[in-house]
Design a protein with these regions (language model features):
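Conserved protein kinase catalytic core
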Residues: 25, 126, 146, 158, ...
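ATP-binding pocket architecture of kinase catalytic cores
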Residues: 1-61, 111
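Short glycine/proline- and charge-enriched loop/turn segments
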Residues: 22-26, 136, 154-160
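An alpha-helical support segment within catalytic cores of ATP-dependent transferases
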Residues: 37-39, 43-119, 186-187
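Active-site activation/catalytic loop segments of kinase-like enzymes and analogous catalytic loops
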Residues: 151-186, 195-203
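Active-site acidic catalytic loop and adjacent metal/ATP-binding pocket
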Residues: 98-151
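Domain-wide signal for the mature, well-folded portions of proteins, strongly enriched
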Residues: 21, 55, 109, 127, ...
Length: 203
């Protein structure tokens, strides 16, 4: 398991310095235990977001990720398993066009809310102490880079859905996460945009 420590340069090449961390994946927790761990998970993600954008040598900005989506779709390589059920029968070019229509607004938002993002903050990548239910760190940093913080938040929220035992747990987790991060007015449309983009960038 890996934990992000810092970025450094080795012979002029950017690299990550990492170390092993203890714990179990948050994906293995029950809904009740995940809810207890959730505030510390939000804090860990917030710690990544607080890193210096100027000192991060990796970037995954929206323009770059949309370019990746264009490439994936052009090769007809979108993995249908990554799509929500309602999108599985939609032509890939239509899915891409839907994202493209929102690009101007989302690019403007990114300019004012750029952070260092984990890139794939799904439940298997949060490590949690099973006794204290405190998050011990994040692993799988292959997509770490500068981006709109909502790209991370959308994935974290969506990927936790299958862990919740009831809808009220999901709503409580949503409120807790944005409270921990100090975001007073969560933008649900912005979250939805990044959920529509993400499946198009794998392939």
């Amino acid at each position: 398991d890996d934990k992000f420590i810092t970025t450094d340069y080795l012979q002029q090449c950017p690299c990550l310095v990492i170390t092993a961390i203890p714990g179990v994946p948050a994906a293995d927790l029950s809904g009740a235990d995940l809810l207890k761990a959730w505030p510390s998970m939000g804090q860990q993600l917030g710690a990544v977001h607080s890193l210096s954008v100027d000192q991060c040598p990796f970037e995954r900005r929206l323009s770059r990720m949309f370019g990746r989506a264009v490439d994936v779709v052009s090769r007809n390589a979108v993995n249908p398993d990554f799509l929500p059920d309602e999108d599985k029968s939609t032509p890939q070019l239509d899915l891409l066009a839907r994202v493209e229509r929102e690009l101007p607004v989302r690019l403007d938002q990114e300019r004012t809310d750029m952070v260092v993002c984990h890139g794939d903050p799904c439940m298997p990548n949060f490590m949690v102490d099973p006794k204290t239910l405190q998050c011990t760190g994040l692993i799988d940093l292959g997509r770490l880079g500068t981006a709109d913080r909502y790209a991370d938040l959308a994935l974290m929220i969506a990927n936790a859905e299958e862990n919740w035992a009831a809808p009220d747990e999901a709503e409580r987790a949503f409120a807790v996460l944005f409270n921990v991060l100090g975001i007073e007015a969560p933008d649900r449309e912005r979250l939805a945009f990044y959920l529509r983009l993400d499946p198009l960038t794998w392939g």
